[in-house]
Amino acid sequence: MNPSSSILPIAFLVNKLQQELALCESELWTPHFNTGRYEGNWTSVSLRSQSGLVSDITSFPNIEYINTSLLERCYYFKEIMDWFQCEKEAVRLLRLGPNSEIKEHVDNDTSYEDGFFRIHVPILTNSEVFFYVDKKRVPMKMGECWYANFQLPHSVENKSGEPRIHLTIDCIRNEWSDKLFAQMGFDTSSFSNQKEYSHEVKQLIIEELSRNPSEINAKIIADLQAK
């Protein structure tokens, strides 16, 4: 069985991460749409989204993503993205406010075995942030680069008086990433076939896309409704 989480053999400069975060602080950070999953303050801005809007923080698989205007100002974030030699989907900054909690939940089809991997790069964090995946604490430090299988139960609690902010990059598995993950001790021989969306999942995707009207999102909705 593959690890529930693993640190990647790459680290990034904390001072550069925090400098670029400062460029993003003036943006309107959008509250996470699933209010039942957290208590306190959980917000985000997008560097790459389905509509190209900074405020579009939804993340669904097998949908085209484009860079936002914010990414064009964030050269170091783009350099980090380019390190991953694979297709990227949603790229976001996720902020968990002081004394806030993301309740335990699962995100479907977000394991490496499903052909997907989500990367976390902590920009602001501290010892009072408790990140658990499959009941095991993941000790992420600023500048480190981590993968976790978010199809497993996971939760985060920020018990500090400071925000916790991560850069997250959603990636599509390929030969390059297989070599990387094999070096990290993963069995890369397994690969799940792409799944068809259930009616309920389609409706959820359509609902979230409808919250950010755009020509691109309208096309995605039409394609989903036609299937």
Predicted regions and their residues:
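Non-heme Fe(II)/2-oxoglutarate
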Residues: 1-84
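Conserved short histidine dyad/triad with adjacent acidic residue
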Residues: 93-112
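Short, conserved beta-strand element in jelly-roll/cupin
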Residues: 95, 112-128
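Short beta-strand His + acidic residue motifs that chelate non-heme Fe in jelly-roll/DSBH
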Residues: 103-105, 129-131, 148-149, 153-160
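A short hydrophobic beta-strand segment most commonly corresponding to one strand
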Residues: 117-122, 145-147, 161-179
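Charged, low-complexity interaction regions
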Residues: 210-219
